Amino acid sequence: MTPEHLPTEQYEAQLAEKVVRLQTMMAPFAAPVPEVFRSPVSHYRMRAEFRLWHDGDDLYHIIFDQQTRSRIRVDSFPAASALINQLMTAMLEGVRNNPVLRHKLFQIDYLTTLSNQAVVSLLYHKKLDDTWREQAEALRDALRAQGLNVHLIGRATKTKIELDQDYIDERLPVGGREMIYRQVENSFTQPNAAMNIQMLEWALDVTKEATGDLLELYCGNGNFSLALARNFDRVLATEIAKPSVAAAQYNIAANHIDNVQIIRMAAEEFTQAMNGVREFNRLQGIDLQSYQCETIFVDPPRSGLDSETEKMVQAYPRILYISCNPETLCRNLETLSQTHNVTRLALFDQFPYTHHMECGVLLTRK
């Protein structure tokens, strides 16, 4: 695979290999046959980041080969959304012959939505001033005149200039409802929107018979907790990143959801609060003991759950675990399978043409 060519004819074979690999990894835990969710074979990534290479008068996007670290020129990127590909061309045309915008520009980050909105961040090794802002506003207006719904951001050391806003609002059809998700620049969002819809609908399906309340750790912008709120009496969710918490609060209001409470704290801190080890001012006014959480949802970083959180989640009758790293999932399952059975397993092909796998498991208490 090269950045400008996707081996779409090999998609079925690479997906089949992932299915076999996941089944082999999950065999020690008596997991059921995985439900397999396919990705679109192209234009599936909603975000992309490129370094910029200045070559005389020419200017182009590059990425670095992961093995050799050599530069690879990228004029088109079929893995990314059609909107990103449009913007890649339009941005370079707007910047290439503009000394103010081009000078010391070293990276461009693109974030797009299925609803055809975009935030583009330009990263510089220089101070940004009012002249830069004027030129950037002119570029933004020219892009919008081409029909591109785009917001521009300038970044430099200790500097962030938003011309309008630093977010876009995604709209996803999930289980017969349209969900609105505010996505903030430089914050985590699911990269493959089509796969995100399938993950949300799978999570809805596996919890449709759930009772009581839901606890979610690492909730981000509320991606899962807001979609799952319809299956539970109440949802209590934790997140540590301030921009994500603010986006989650907006998303709660935008989706007219009244049974979700977001707490800004780390999963490890929440474990201490639940166990009565520490008291936190952030929890004033929230009666943790009033929640009857019978399901816990975790979508941890690649490192998986730490040992204390492993112990904490074992206290819940149902554990819904989305993993971007099956190796650490299996490590966690060595502990979790002592008290719970794997009753559902899913493979989400979030990252086609790579060895990476995203998967989901539902565990129920033995």
Curated annotation (Swiss-Prot):
Keyword field: Methyltransferase, S-adenosyl-L-methionine, Transferase, tRNA processing
Domain of life: Bacteria
SUPFAM superfamilies found in the cross-reference section: S-adenosyl-L-methionine-dependent methyltransferases (SSF53335)
A GO MF label: tRNA (uracil(54)-C5)-methyltransferase activity, S-adenosyl methionine-dependent
Family of this protein: Belongs to the class I-like SAM-binding methyltransferase superfamily. RNA M5U methyltransferase family. TrmA subfamily.
Organism of derivation: Klebsiella pneumoniae (strain 342)
GO biological process entries: tRNA methylation
Catalytic activity: uridine(54) in tRNA + S-adenosyl-L-methionine = 5-methyluridine(54) in tRNA + S-adenosyl-L-homocysteine + H(+); uridine(341) in tmRNA + S-adenosyl-L-methionine = 5-methyluridine(341) in tmRNA + S-adenosyl-L-homocysteine + H(+)
Pfam families, sorted: tRNA_U5-meth_tr
Residues noted as binding S-adenosyl-L-methionine in the record, renumbered to the chain: Q190, Y218, N223, E239, D299
PROSITE patterns (UniProt xref): SAM_MT_RNA_M5U, TRMA_1, TRMA_2
Active site: C324 (nucleophile), E358 (proton acceptor)
CC terms in the record's Gene Ontology section: cytosol
NCBIfam families, per the entry: trmA_only
Protein name stated in the entry: tRNA/tmRNA (uracil-C(5))-methyltransferase
